[in-house]
Regions:
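Short amphipathic alpha-helix with an adjacent loop that forms part of the alpha/beta core around
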Residues: 149-163
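Short, charged N-terminal beta->alpha structural module
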Residues: 114-136
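A short beta-strand-loop structural module common to alpha/beta enzyme folds
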Residues: 137-146
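Acyltransferase
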Residues: 76, 83-101, 111, 300-330
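Catalytic beta-strand/loop cores that center a nucleophilic Ser/Cys/Thr
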Residues: 242-289
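Cysteine-nucleophile active-site neighborhood
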Residues: 161-247, 251-253, 310
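A short, charged/proline- and glycine-enriched loop
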Residues: 107-113
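Conserved hydrophobic core element of enzyme catalytic domains
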Residues: 1-73
Length: 330
């Protein structure tokens, strides 16, 4: 008996040695996602299985010789609407001295690190790798916990004491922000001006669900998008050039995965980014604290300027109390 971690078994041949001969099971599958045809997914799974049986035994299971479609295979260019997608290189080359370390809490203390709250999202590690490739240490901590409200507050205190981060990122994830108590605790602390290290307000960035958590913490409503769900779609994002959008074009392409959107209310946060219609909020910032949120995924290969946006956030410095008072006076 061994222990193994399995990824998605899209096309698999599982073999077993019997008393007299080998036996094999062929498995193939696909995924029904937004925009796909279930019937075509089933046919594709049969096609995948047939490729295995043909290579192993010389016949196509469930198909005649003429049933399977024959199509031209080619490498197609990246759509021009995306601009230059630098992340499509075989490997992002970064000097060893510039690469940050990645730790999972509890872990040894990493100096000048970014605290990344993981909300059970498959992209969390991608975000951590992107942060590290930009030269910053990162510590990952799970945002979902069964602790009560008092214990959550104590856990947040413990994490802040041990990690002493220079900044916090509230990561993306499935479901709604309230499903992740630690994420909501950090969101509320930041809005209240209580996310402090050495009397400095440390920067916080919310990504997708993390962005939604910030809105909820400030009293905004989280609703089903009136324009429907968007899954894995590069989308045109408009912005006003403030917050993490400073220095970026007023229209940029970013990858979206969301069915929920925030409705703004009067509070401490202000929208600074919208979808192409100008109706759906895609970004927000705090009036005077270093708090930003974006509804999209900047770490995605479908976000050509996403790495630049993350770098802008990572370069933000903590805000001293005296500077905060000056900003409030303005």
């Amino acid at each position: 008996q061994g222990v193994a971690d399995w990824n998605i078994l899209i096309r698999t041949l599982e073999t077993h040695s019997g008393p007299e001969k080998w036996h094999a099971t062929v498995q193939a599958g696909g995924g029904v996602v937004i925009g796909s045809s279930p019937a075509e997914e089933v046919e594709e799974a049969r096609w995948k299985a047939a490729a295995v049986t043909e290579s192993a035994w010389g016949f196509r299971t469930g198909f005649t010789e003429n049933d399977l479609p024959e199509r031209e295979v080619g490498i197609f260019p990246v759509p021009t609407g995306l601009g230059t997608v630098q992340s499509l290189m075989p490997g992002l080359r970064v000097g060893d001295e510039e690469v940050g370390a990645i730790g999972v809490y509890p872990c040894e203390k990493l100096d000048r690190c970014t605290l990344l709250i993981d909300n059970l999202d498959s992209f969390t590690r991608n975000i951590a790798e992107e942060i590290a490739s930009l030269g910053h240490n990162v510590v990952i901590v799970g945002g979902k916990t069964q602790s009560d409200k008092k214990s959550i507050s104590n856990l947040a205190d413990e994490i802040m004491r041990h990690v002493q981060p220079e900044r916090v990122i509230l990561g993306p994830g499935p479901s709604v922000p309230e499903s992740y108590p630690l994420t909501m605790e950090f969101a509320r602390r930041s809005i209240r001006g209580e996310l402090v290290v050495d009397r400095n307000h440390i920067p916080l960035l919310g990504l997708c669900l993390g962005h939604q958590a910030l809105g909820i913490a400030d009293g905004w409503d989280l609703i089903q998008s009136p324009m429907g769900a968007v899954h894995g779609t590069p989308s045109l994002i408009k912005n006003d050039g403030t917050g993490v959008f400073q220095g970026l074009p007023s229209e940029i392409t970013m990858m979206r995965y969301n069915s929920l959107v925030l409705e703004p209310k009067k509070g401490s946060l202000v929208p600074n980014s919208w979808d192409v219609t100008g109706e759906l909020v895609m970004g927000l910032r705090h009036f005077h604290l270093p708090i930003d949120g974006v509804q999209f995924h900047p770490e995605s290969v479908g976000s050509p300027r996403g790495r630049e946006l993350l770098d802008k956030f990572l370069r933000k410095r903590p805000l001293a109390f005296s500077d905060q008072l000056s900003r409030q006076a303005e």
